[in-house]
Regions:
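Surface-exposed loop/turn motifs in large extracellular/passenger domains
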Residues: 21-81, 86-116, 121-157, 161-197, ...
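Gram-negative bacterial Sec-dependent N-terminal signal peptides
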Residues: 1-20
Length: 675
């Protein structure tokens, strides 16, 4: 279903010939002005600059106000739109171009209600138009923003920057070529109720479903910042975005960077129903030349801090969100810098996963999509996360060739807090629902995980490739990293708990040095085939002083049908650790693990070192499972107690070095070298 109701969600639909009268409005024309319940034209539009519509735009109309800055405030009353800059709508004069300019804009809202808050300027079905706005300062401390009765699939309430819209649907507007150029944007929110998505940047919206040469809508802006210190946010589909939006066919956005900061030091809950996204939104596009696109020539970030209560219902995303919904829809996003997430709020409860890179979601009949970022960083100091933590990007695909890549390194640093899902150093590629496609979430550099405190439910050093539902046709999922490094010097590591929709999903392992390939038990054998792959050139795990409550695997982990995990060189070092609990023993595997009809888990070279540690289960110098292979293995044990077996089988060649006082329950297999 095309977004035929989206137009109603963003602005009024009345724009055809039958509605030629100028809309009720108040235009400040650069004069510092305060509006309230006593102001004229209640339910109309408010502009800090000039208002241009239809017949009042002629060949000689002066649209250039670049030397004029604006400053308007709304304290009460009920209006349609509050616009900091200029507004131009469906001009009658169509022979020439329209360069609509304004200087810096400032717009403040302390009370009252509007359906749409726009910090910059707006163009509505205005062809051959360039909308130029200086820097934007937008402040909201109270009031109601958005349409409470909207039935839109994604209502929008507040836009920090500028807004351009058009449709190609016959009789509904003018197919327009419009570009908005906006400077740096700051949107600060300390109160108010928002019945729709909030964007720190600008929005380009083609709300029609008709393909054609036009509309062509573009937003170009500087750095956008969304700062939240209070408020209630009711956008169940989307949420809050530091960046901009490209919505509909041939919509595009370009910026210099974006960020979201949520800081609550009050006693009032900040409740966000929806996602928190540092970058842009891309959705409802077309295919080929009709695809949506986003280019961020800089970095993106999300920070969640403060002593007060903060609640989110959906995922927190450091990069951009590509949400493909239409048949054959395609989309692309690039971030030339890094994406960063910092969570340091003891009273924050995040309802879903944390994704360091960009997130790409597709449906059964959508097309290809790609997202990339140069590097990512996720830091968790305090708070509760009721989902997985992904260092790289994520793909949840059902069709097409879909990728979310990190063209550099990823870093996850956990100093405290609770993660009720798995911590995944690389990317997460997910495919399912009996569809077909090729999904990938790769990291070209090194994925790093550093844990000094807190509690997490599983650690995966590399990426996670995952399939669910029933078999598809020729479907592939890949989550690979160049190298993986895990350093754990404190905290508690429980077994892997993969948080997703449906029944609880766990693996009997706490730490995996490489990647994990995992298909649900609803996936059958080779009819049709499925390929789930993770690769790592080298994996390194160092555990010193932590508490680990389930098995430890130095290599990769392949679980169930179609799964492959490969690591060239796996290194595992354990010292002064507490392994196991009263109810569970812990086994240690130098190599990889393959189980339940997995294709293979392979390690070319494995190194294991255990010092001053008691192992409640067994130690395997090779791997585990019929399809698990290890080339060469070396193990060094110093002052180690192994309650059960020391298993020296599972590798082509094994060397063992004993130092100090060691104790084992039994020995299985034979090493080629003992010292």
């Amino acid at each position: 279903m095309k977004k035929t109701i989206i137009a109603a969600s963003l602005t009024a639909l009345a724009m055809g010939p039958a509605f030629a009268a100028i809309n009720p409005h108040n235009e400040a024309m650069g004069k510092e002005t305060t509006y309230d319940e006593k102001s004229d034209n209640q339910k109309g539009k408010l502009t800090g600059g000039w208002y241009y519509q239809e017949e009042n735009v002629q060949e000689n109309t002066d649209l250039n106000h670049g030397s004029v800055s604006t400053n308007i405030t709304l304290t009460g009353g009920s209006f349609d739109e509050l616009i900091g800059g200029n507004h131009i709508k469906q001009p009658t004069y169509k022979e020439g171009t329209h360069n609509v300019t304004i200087g810096d804009t400032k717009v403040t809202m302390t009370g009252g209600s509007v359906e749409y808050f726009i910090g910059g300027s707006k163009a509505n079905n205005s062809d051959k138009t360039t909308l130029i706005t200086g820097d934007v300062t937008a402040v909201i401390s109270g009031g109601s923003i958005g349409n409470q009765s909207s039935t839109s699939e994604y209502p929008v309430s507040a836009i920090g920057g500028s807004y351009v819209k058009s449709t190609g649907n016959p009789g509904e507007g003018t197919p327009a070529s419009t570009t908005a150029e906006t400077g740096n944007i700051s949107l600060s929110i300390s109160g108010g109720t928002f019945y729709g998505a909030v964007f720190g940047g600008s929005v380009a919206d083609n709300y029609g479903s008709t393909e054609g040469q036009k509309p062509i809508l573009k937003n170009i802006s500087g750095i956008s910042e969304l700062k939240i210190q209070g408020g209630k946010f009711e956008s169940s589909k989307f949420g809050v975005f530091g960046g901009s939006a490209a919505i509909g066919m041939k919509s595009a956005t370009t910026s210099s960077g974006s960020s979201v900061s949520i800081n609550n030091t009050s006693e009032t809950l900040i409740d966000i129903v929806g996602r928190v996204v540092g970058g842009d939104l891309l959705t409802y596009g077309g295919s080929g030349e009709n695809a949506t696109s986003s280019k961020i020539n800089g970095s993106t970030s999300v920070s969640i801090t403060g002593s007060g209560e903060i609640k989110t219902s959906e995922s927190v995303i450091g990069g951009s969100l590509l949400n493909l919904l239409e048949k054959d829809e395609e989309s692309s996003s690039t971030i030339s810098g890094t994406s960063e997430i910092v969570i340091d709020a003891a009273n924050a409860v995040l309802g879903d996963e944390v994704i360091g890179g960009s997130y790409v979601r597709t449906q059964k009949d959508t097309g290809d999509a790609s997202a990339s970022v140069k590097g990512t960083s996720v830091t968790i100091k305090a708070g509760t996360i009721n989902g997985n933590v992904v260092g790289g990007g994520k793909v949840n695909g059902k069709h097409g060739t879909v990728e979310s890549s990190v063209d550099g390194d990823t870093v996850i640093s956990i100093f405290g807090g609770t993660v009720n899902g798995a911590v995944i150093g690389g990317g997460h590629a997910k495919i399912g629902d009996g569809t077909s496609g090729d999904m990938s979430a790769d990291v070209t550099g090194t994925s790093r995980i550093q844990i000094t405190g807190g509690t997490v439910n599983g650690v995966i050093g590399g990426g996670l490739s995952y399939a669910y539902g029933t078999n598809g046709a020729d479907w592939k999922s890949t989550a690979s990293v160049g190298k993986s490094e895990v350093i754990i010097t404190g905290g508690t590591i429980e077994a892997v708990n993969y948080v997703a929709t449906g029944p609880k999903q766990t693996l009997p392992v706490a730490i995996v040095g490489g990647g994990v390939s995992w298909s649900k038990d609803t996936i059958s054998g080779d009819n049709p085939p499925i390929e789930l792959t993770t690769t790592t050139s080298s994996s390194s795990v160092v555990i010193d002083g932590a508490t680990v409550k389930d098995d430890i695997v130095g290599g990769g982990y392949a679980y169930q049908t179609g799964s492959t995990a490969s690591v060239e060189n796996a290194s595992l070092s354990i010292s002064n650790a507490t392994l196991g609990s009263d109810s569970n023993k812990v086994n240690v595997y130098a190599g990889g693990f393959a189980s339940d009809n997995a294709k293979s888990s392979s390690v070319e070279s494995a190194q294991l070192q255990i010092t001053a540690t008691s192992v409640s289960g067994s130690v395997y110098t090779g791997g585990s499972g019929t399809n698990s292979t290890v080339g060469t293995s070396s193990a060094a044990l110093t002052d180690v107690t192994i309650s059960e077996a020391l298993d020296l089988s599972g590798a082509t060649e094994t060397a063992v070095v004993f130092t100090g006082v060691n104790s084992v329950g039994s020995v299985t297999g034979t090493a080629q070298s003992y010292t």
